[in-house]
Curated annotation (Swiss-Prot):
Component of the RAVE complex composed of RAV1, RAV2 and CBF3D/SKP1. Within the complex, it interacts directly with RAV1 and CBF3D. Interacts with the V-ATPase V1 subunits VMA1, VMA2 and VMA8. It holds the Pfam family Rogdi_lz. One of its GO terms (cellular component) is early endosome membrane. This is Regulator of V-ATPase in vacuolar membrane protein 2. Present with 2860 molecules/cell in log phase SD medium. It comes from the Eukaryota. Its main location: cytoplasm. One of its GO terms (biological process) is vacuolar proton-transporting V-type ATPase complex assembly. It is a peripheral membrane protein. Component of the RAVE complex, which is required for stable assembly of the vacuolar ATPase complex V-ATPase under many conditions. May be required for transport between the early endosome and the late endosome/prevacuolar compartment (PVC). It is found in: Cytoplasm; Early endosome membrane. Keywords: Cytoplasm, Endosome, Membrane, Protein transport, Transport. InterPro entries: RAVE2/Rogdi.
Length: 351
C-alpha cells in the first residue's frame, strides 16, 4: 500500500483557508510542543558547562616538547619544560625553562610568573560571558509567547554558542604573533625584557586556547637594526618594512628596485665587495636582502623582527575537553531546532 502526499492540499475550497494564519499556528505549535519542552534540559547542560568554567579547582599541567636536555645538546633543537597552573579563567602559576640554540649561545632561560599575579585567559573569559548570555536568553524563551521574538532570540543564542566553539578552537588575531605585541610575556613576568632580550634577539610568548587545549608558543626573534627598515612611524605604528610591502602590493607595475629608490633606499649589486659596503651604509641594501626583509620582517612590540626559531607545545586541560564535547552536542541539538523554526517562520511570513 502506498500514499501520495500533496503539499498544501486542503479539504474543501482553497479560499476558506488562510495560509498565513496556518503557518503561524504551525510555528507556534513547534515552539510550544517541541522546542520549549527541551529548553530545561538545554539550560541545565549550559549551566553545567558554566559551572565547570567557574570552578575554583586548581589544575596543574606539565609543559614539555618531549626532547630531553641531554639529547638537545646533540641535535641542537629548542626545548621547553615546566608546569602551568590554571584556576578558573586565570593562569595562577607559570614556571618553564626554555632553551633556544641561537639565544644567548644556547643558555637555558627560566621564566617564573610573578607571585600573587593572575593572568587572565581572554578566550576563557569570553566563553564564560557568552554562556551567561545564552542562559539569560534561554530563560527568557521559556516564557516568550511571540513567535518572531522567539525565533530571533534563539538565533542570537546559536550565534553565541558558535562563537564560543570558535574561541575554543582558535585564538583571535589580536592574541597571536605579531598582533599580540608580546602581551603574555609583559603581563606575567616582572621586568621581562631583562630575561627575554639580548643584544640581537628577543623572545616572544603566546598563551592561548587552541583545539580545546592550552597552547604555548615561544619564538626566538632576530632584531632588525638596519635603517630605515627598523624605523617605526609613531603615528601609524607601521614600520618602513610594512610601508614598502604595502606599496609593492598596490603598485604591481613597479619593480622592487624602483620602489626602494623612490623611498631613498640605495640598491647595491650582490657582489661580495658591495655586500660589505652595504652592511656599513644604513640606506644601502642588496636586492636579495631587501626581499628577505620583506618576506620575513614583521612589526612586533614597536620594533621590526624576523623569526629564527619557534616552539609550539600544548597541554591537555580536562575542563576544556569536557566543555567542548558538551557544547558540540548542544550545538547539534539546537541547530536542528533552529532549522525547523526558521523554515516554519519563513512560511508564516509568506502571504
Amino acid at each position: 500500500m502506498s500514499v501520495d502526499l500533496f503539499p498544501n492540499d486542503r479539504f474543501g475550497a482553497e479560499d476558506k483557508y488562510d495560509n498565513f494564519k496556518d503557518a503561524v499556528k504551525e510555528c507556534s505549535w513547534l515552539i510550544e510542543e517541541i522546542v520549549k519542552p527541551q529548553l530545561p534540559n538545554i539550560i541545565d547542560n549550559f549551566s553545567k558547562c558554566l559551572e565547570m568554567l567557574e570552578s575554583d579547582q586548581i589544575f596543574k599541567m606539565p609543559v614539555s616538547n618531549g626532547i630531553p636536555n641531554e639529547s638537545n645538546k646533540q641535535n641542537d633543537s629548542p626545548t621547553v619544560k615546566g608546569v602551568i597552573t590554571r584556576q578558573g579563567q586565570y593562569i595562577v602559576d607559570f614556571h618553564i625553562v626554555v632553551r633556544f640554540p641561537q639565544f644567548q649561545r644556547g643558555k637555558q632561560v627560566m621564566f617564573r610568573m610573578n607571585t600573587g599575579l593572575n593572568f587572565l585567559l581572554i578566550q576563557f573569559s569570553k566563553i564564560m560571558t557568552h554562556l551567561k548570555n545564552i542562559l539569560e536568553i534561554l530563560n527568557q524563551l521559556q516564557v516568550a509567547t511571540d513567535v518572531s521574538e522567539f525565533v530571533s532570540k534563539f538565533g542570537v543564542a546559536m550565534e553565541l554558542l558558535n562563537h564560543s566553539l570558535i574561541l575554543l578552537q582558535n585564538p583571535p588575531r589580536d592574541l597571536v604573533f605579531p598582533e599580540d605585541n608580546n602581551f603574555a610575556m609583559k603581563e606575567m613576568f616582572q621586568d621581562c625584557y631583562s630575561v627575554c632580550e639580548s643584544t640581537a634577539h628577543i623572545l616572544g610568548l603566546e598563551l592561548t586556547l587552541c583545539r580545546n587545549e592550552l597552547c604555548i608558543e615561544l619564538r626566538n626573534l632576530i632584531k632588525v637594526t638596519k635603517k630605515p627598515w627598523c624605523e617605526i612611524d609613531s603615528k601609524t605604528g607601521r614600520s618602513f618594512c610594512d610601508q614598502i610591502r604595502n606599496q609593492v602590493t598596490n603598485e604591481r607595475n613597479k619593480t622592487l628596485s624602483k620602489i626602494l629608490s623612490e623611498n631613498g633606499v640605495q640598491v647595491q649589486d650582490s657582489t661580495l665587495l658591495n655586500h660589505i659596503i652595504s652592511s656599513f651604509q644604513s640606506e644601502a641594501i642588496t636586492l636579495p636582502e631587501a626581499q628577505e626583509l620583506l618576506r620575513r620582517g614583521v612589526t612586533f612590540d614597536n620594533r621590526v623582527v624576523m623569526e629564527c626559531e619557534k616552539l609550539i607545545v600544548s597541554t591537555s586541560d580536562p575542563t576544556l575537553i569536557s566543555i567542548s564535547a558538551k557544547l558540540n552536542s548542544l550545538k547539534a541539538s539546537m541547530a536542528n531546532h533552529q532549522a525547523n523554526l526558521v523554515a516554519s517562520k519563513q512560511l508564516s511570513t509568506y502571504k
